[in-house]
Curated annotation (Swiss-Prot):
Its main location: cytoplasm. It comes from Geobacillus sp. (strain WCH70). This is Acetyl-coenzyme A carboxylase carboxyl transferase subunit alpha. Pathway: Lipid metabolism; malonyl-CoA biosynthesis; malonyl-CoA from acetyl-CoA: step 1/1. The gene is accA. Acetyl-CoA carboxylase is a heterohexamer composed of biotin carboxyl carrier protein (AccB), biotin carboxylase (AccC) and two subunits each of ACCase subunit alpha (AccA) and ACCase subunit beta (AccD). It is found in: Cytoplasm. PANTHER family: ACETYL-COENZYME A CARBOXYLASE CARBOXYL TRANSFERASE SUBUNIT ALPHA, ACETYL-COENZYME A CARBOXYLASE CARBOXYL TRANSFERASE SUBUNIT ALPHA, CHLOROPLASTIC. SUPFAM superfamilies: ClpP/crotonase.
Length: 325
């Protein structure tokens, strides 16, 4: 059963009514097809109205949906011969990050991504998709291996952020993230990054230094969660909706700002409504990206990545915006 989100509540009653009428028609000789058709038309219009006018906070809710597809869901549908690799060769294996070797359309690749759980037990095992330092070091080990064997790297980003616990800090969380940023910038193989859910802070960016960066239509990418921003700016986490409107965290915002390259369309209602179709949409963009990047040599890939990130964070203003005392 797919959980309904807060903004989808107006749809629930209509769907329930349609279901009840269909069941009643099955169990009796009464023909209710015309009434059902009218309700279905009304439902379709309401769905169009809601999903065509999603607010940033609505998209945050979709990105956090408990049934939203994870990295492993996409690996299963997009890649063959996936062999998961474990451990950072230093401390241990962090299950909040999965990664390994696979084939994509016959091409050997390295695929890495954050991994949330599907239920409480798995979320605890995977630390709710919030990696420890050993997770990032595992990812870096796989990236360096990919460079050695000249395999393209594909990263799926989906985390609230790096785990901020005491043990993680003791084992060098900030150093692990910084090291990934530094090393990814200089890798001589193509890197394609796709934000599939939440892209939270440095924990997301540690897998996000790519030649091409794409986002699913209802994913988010930001330096902090809306709740965290609201707590800092206004001392009230309940103002998260207001923060989401202000922070420019949606795919549309980030495409306009030049942070990402392409928005991957989602099925109506979110990726969790049809995982196979969503994987097919990702497949189209991923094929296109790799086709472009595989034409470039290592030096060009590094330079392109450098130029891309150099542009992020620049701003422009007109003479009228300058106030002179």
């Amino acid at each position: 059963m797919v959980a309904e989100l807060e903004f989808e509540k107006p749809l629930i009653e209509l769907r329930k009514k349609i279901s009840e009428l269909k069941e009643f028609m099955k169990s009796t000789d009464v023909d209710l097809s015309s009434e059902i058709e009218k309700l279905e038309a009304r439902l379709a219009k309401l769905e169009n109205d809601i999903y065509a006018n999603l607010t940033p906070w609505d998209r945050v809710q979709i990105a956090r949906h408990p049934n939203r597809p994870t990295t492993l869901d996409y690996i299963e549908r997009l890649f063959t011969h996936f062999l998961e690799c474990h451990g950072d060769r230093c401390f241990g294996d962090d299950e909040a990050i999965v990664g390994g070797i696979a084939k994509y359309d016959g091409l050997p690749v390295t695929v890495i991504g954050h991994q949330r759980g599907k239920d409480t037990k798995e979320n605890i095992r995977r630390n709710f998709g919030m990696p420890h330092p050993e997770g990032y070091r595992k990812a870096l080990r796989l990236m360096k291996q990919a460079e050695k064997f000249q395999r393209p790297i594909i990263c799926f980003i989906d985390t609230k952020g790096a785990y901020p616990g005491k043990a993680a800090e003791e084992r060098g969380q900030s150093e692990a993230i910084a090291r990934n940023l530094f090393e990814m910038a200089g890798l001589t193989v193509p890197i394609v990054c796709i934000v599939i859910g939440e892209g939270g802070s440095g924990g997301a960016l540690a897998l996000g230094v790519g030649n091409h960066i794409h986002m699913l239509e209802n994913s988010t990418y930001s330096v902090i969660s809306p709740e965290g921003a609201a707590a800092i700016l206004w001392k009230d986490a309940s103002l998260a909706q207001r923060a989401a409107e202000t922070m420019k965290i949606t795919a549309n915002d980030l495409k306009e700002l030049g942070v990402i390259d392409e928005i991957i369309p989602e099925v109506r209602g979110g990726a969790h409504r049809d995982v196979d179709q969503q994987a097919a949409e990702i497949d189209k963009v991923l094929k296109r990206s790799l086709k472009q990047l595989l034409k470039l040599d290592g030096e060009t890939l590094v330079q392109q990545r450098y130029e891309k990130f150099k542009q992020i964070g620049q701003f422009a203003f007109s003479r009228d915006d300058i106030w002179v005392r």
